[in-house]
Amino acid sequence: MSSLSILFATSEMAPWVKTGGLGDVAAALPAALRKAGHDIRVLLPAYPALKQAFPTATTVAELPAFAPGLPASRLLAAQTGKLELLLLDCPELYDRPGNPYLDATGRDWPDNALRFGLLSRVAARLGQPDSPLSWQPDIVHANDWQTALAPAYLHYQGGAASVVTVHNIAFQGCFGREMLAALGLPEHAWRFDGVEYHDQLSFLKAGLQLASQISTVSPTYAREIQDEHFGYGLAPLLRHRSAELRGILNGVDTDLWNPATDPVLATGYAANRLAAKRTNKAALQTEMGLEVTADRPLFGVISRLTSQKGLDLLLTVAEGLPELPAQLVVLGSGDKLMEAGFVELAKRFPAQIVVKIGFDEGLAHRIEAGADCFVMPSRFEPCGLNQMYSLRYGTPPIVRATGGLADTVVDVCEDTLADKSANGFVLDGDTPHALWLTIEHVCRTWQDKKLWQRIQQNGMRRDFSWTHAANEYVALYRDAIATRA
């Protein structure tokens, strides 16, 4: 089957600009599509970090002011590996340090509508016959609200087929009606089946309404966001477009997250060499100042410390861990009261509980390798990555059956052990008591070393590479092109 030309439009891309999962996807999915033989280019703003990383990027197009509120800009071309980047250079909109969406006080930049309206407009322009480049994509792939206006421009002005991917539906990019003219959208776009949403212009709603096809980052999340509880007001629209909506589970970087070759571990290991994992446990206990012992399970957490992540449940029951007996290591930051609560616990039980506020990439890898079990009781989780890292590292996770957690973690029971799919523990409910019962179940199961090893190996043998996801996206792109035709 013929290869496709794809424009992947994003507001962030690891390792240069990342606030969440979108940054990881923007680095990994285009690379997987390129490896599969497709002609893909990634469009993103020329933030300071990108301009510093690619000082020799060349100008490939000068772009006029497309609308009253949008300044002139230019496109720079750069190369990372075999992947071509198109950097949208507009210093007055993007030459700002730090977080791409928030100022130093943590507030949204007041001109975010213009900043990401321009990004969306340029993405659409590259997919139109009058593209400033000699290259034109078959498909424009928008991601989250920051580029979700691109399908609207393509709908009203004509051009390539489009896909919009929802990474987190809670963020919708809503602005005042005055932005309609400022962004160069036609007056007739202001209607319920256009860009209007509760008397505001919503970038995400516009994309969901007008894209050729829609995706989100796991099959379960695709179902959940059609329900009022998870849809943040957009569930009726998503139910209406359910035939064009599919969930495609994110992959993980299997080179970066590989316990056999991970350079920051005390020693490498694999599914057939699990004894070496115990060395990593002892090394983690030593590094974190915990009692070095093989006789109690070590639970690990790497997370934002928020109620959305379910860490309030763990905070409520964690003081019981030393009596089980069990240990706990926590790496993360978030809600200040929750941070303080975990820090106080660590002070009370210094040999069995340790808490590090902040983030450390190397330590994250060592926790995945050294912990016996990973705790991730999120109340909602569109896809989630840490549960897949945990499975790769032979560290069975505790999760709730939501979003991508439900699509990747199979609860330990008689049937799943028999068919070799059991790889983790799914807690029944959304209460501290439910989590505690699951922790006790984990501790009992962990005592049976042969059974525990089977569970570890089941998880380690799952394929979480991006190859499968890339193939699903190609099928989605072809459906979008057929729909547009």
Curated annotation (Swiss-Prot):
It comes from the Bacteria. Pathway: Glycan biosynthesis; glycogen biosynthesis. GO terms for molecular function: alpha-1,4-glucan glucosyltransferase (ADP-glucose donor) activity; alpha-1,4-glucan glucosyltransferase (UDP-glucose donor) activity. It catalyses: [(1->4)-alpha-D-glucosyl](n) + ADP-alpha-D-glucose = [(1->4)-alpha-D-glucosyl](n+1) + ADP + H(+). ADP-alpha-D-glucose binds at residue 18. Its EC number is 2.4.1.21. One of its GO terms (biological process) is glycogen biosynthetic process. InterPro entries: Glyco_trans_1, GS/SS, Starch_synth_cat_dom. Pfam families: Glyco_transf_5 (PF08323), Glycos_transf_1 (PF00534). Gene3D superfamilies: Glycogen Phosphorylase B. Keywords: Glycogen biosynthesis, Glycosyltransferase, Transferase. It is an enzyme of class 2 (transferase). Belongs to the glycosyltransferase 1 family. Bacterial/plant glycogen synthase subfamily. Synthesizes alpha-1,4-glucan chains using ADP-glucose. This is Glycogen synthase.
